[in-house]
Each structure stands twice: as structure tokens, then as C-alpha cells.
Amino acid sequence: ALIIAVIIRSFFIQPFYIPSSSMEPTLLIGDRLFVTKYSYGYSKHSFPFSPPVINGRVLSNSPQIGDVIVFKTPADNRTDYIKRLIGLPGDNIQFISGDLVVNNINILKSRVSKNDVIYCGKQTIKVNTFTEQLPNGKTHNTVYLKDYSFQNSDIFTVPEKHYFFLGDNRDC
């Protein structure tokens, strides 16, 4: 039974628990979900303890902008991150007056008529909810602090063989 469980978890589906508010309002603290393991192929990180049995990825499909993806970083092989894919290799990402800009295209953002309160660490914060539409047409909800500061950033170019992710909760 243990071997079957390891095979299922390594190759097919894996359960995850949402520990933080970074993906609110899409995923809430305490949510539990199953993630398919085969969507983007397999790498050494697909297996328990990340043994170096595979170099690179096999049976891989390319992720699409807007996909919610579970991943590990090269610097931290133990922590699973769950974020939304915003930029592909070579894309330019920037925030201008609080608006997300990808490859010089302002990401369309429309206000959802409700006001929300979400958890940020151990405190609750008031947020405005928006629906964003990415350049490929995918839509999702995001939240920003109710009195957000209209942040600006430098242009970031996504390096080759890398991706750019953001949580749907943009200010916490």
C-alpha cells in the first residue's frame, strides 16, 4: 500500500494545504486541494527527496500565462509555492501606479463591487477586489489593499528558462 501511495503521489496527484493568504481570494488559508503531477511533465522534484534520477524535464508541456502552479525554487527544495504564472522567459514585467504591465501591455483590471476583508499574517486587512484579464484572455480575481499606495517598480525581464509568478493577493 505504501508503494502504491508513493507512486500515485509522485506521478498522478498530490494533496496540498494552503498555509498563507498570498493566493486570496482564489485560494484561502486552510484550503486543501489536489494537484495533478503530470500537467507539465516530470523532473527530479516530482519524487520524494528530489533524487537526481532525471536531468531536466520529461514528458513536458509548456505552462500558460494565468495557470496556478505548484513549484519549488532552486534555492529552496523543501518549500512548495502556489502562485499564478504571470511572465514567461523574455517577458518584461512592471508595476506602474499599482497596475500590472506585461510586455508594455496594461493588464485590464475592473473593480468587483464588493469590499472584502482578508487575513494577512495574524491581522485582517480591508481590500478591494478586482478581476484581471491577462493578454491571453484568462481572467482571475485579485485583491489590493483598500488604501493601496499605487506602487511602481523597475522593469524586470524574466530570464531564459525561468518564469515569473505572483500571488493573487498583491499587497500582503
Stretch-by-stretch model annotation:
Residues A1-F11:
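Hydrophobic membrane-insertion alpha-helices, especially the h-region
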Residues I13-D31:
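Alpha-helical transmembrane signal-anchor/signal-peptide segments
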Residues P25-C172:
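Soluble "head" domains of membrane/secretory-pathway proteins
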